[in-house]
């Protein structure tokens, strides 16, 4: 059963995420890629902007079927509670679906500016040569859900567990 307390309606989580993962249709398995992004909210419509080179598997798959699923997450922290001898993981995440559209040439600079603003608020100028060589896409969001598992840190037995080097499976 899903924990209703973890569902979140506000999407401020997006501003804290640094990568969006896009899942596309491929046969026989989905194809997923992590990309950086910018966002814009127009009325009730959420739009994500990404950039890519021209050509490649991602572009080929999106040309066949522009419908995608996406995921982003942030604020990861492994913690331990001595009182009940349990570990858990703090996180915030957003998942959803959307449709990818190519950004027209005359709107590419706006898309790249929104992308840069997600990571750095200062204005930057773009070299027209590189803007021309960059393909921009927008993801028009159909639906999206946010979740948060952020237990309070104010209990005396709450201990953050530091990751030790690489995170890897003991089976590898």
Protein language model features and the residues they cover:
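Histidine-centered metal-chelating micro-motifs
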Residues: 55-60, 78
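A generic structural signal for nonpolar/aromatic side chains embedded in well-ordered alpha-helices
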Residues: 13-14, 61-62, 115
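Short beta-strand segments
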Residues: 17-54, 70
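Short N-terminal helix-initiation segments at or just after the protein's N-terminus
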Residues: 10-14, 32-47, 76-88
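Short, structured patches in soluble enzyme cores that scaffold and shape functional sites
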Residues: 24-26, 52, 72-74, 100, ...
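Short, basic/aromatic recognition patches
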Residues: 1-21
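Short catalytic/metal-binding and nucleic-acid-binding patches
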Residues: 64-71, 79
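Charged, gly/pro-rich active-site loop segments
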Residues: 2, 77-172
């Amino acid at each position: 059963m899903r924990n209703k307390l973890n569902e979140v309606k506000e999407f401020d989580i997006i501003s804290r995420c640094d990568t969006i993962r896009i899942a596309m249709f491929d046969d026989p398995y989905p194809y997923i890629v992590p990309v950086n992004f910018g966002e814009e909210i127009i009325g009730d419509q959420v739009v994500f902007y990404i950039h890519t080179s021209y050509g490649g598997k991602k572009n080929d798959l999106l040309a066949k079927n522009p419908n995608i699923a996406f995921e982003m997450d942030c604020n990861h922290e492994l913690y331990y509670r001595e009182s009940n001898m349990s570990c858990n993981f703090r996180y915030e995440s957003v998942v959803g679906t959307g449709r990818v559209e190519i950004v027209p040439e005359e709107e590419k600079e706006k898309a790249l500016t929104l992308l840069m603003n997600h990571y750095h608020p200062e204005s930057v100028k773009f070299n027209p040569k590189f803007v021309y060589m960059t393909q921009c896409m927008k993801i028009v969001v159909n639906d999206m859900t946010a979740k948060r598992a952020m237990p309070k840190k104010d209990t005396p037995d709450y201990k953050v567990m530091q990751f030790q080097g690489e995170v890897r499976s003991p089976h590898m």
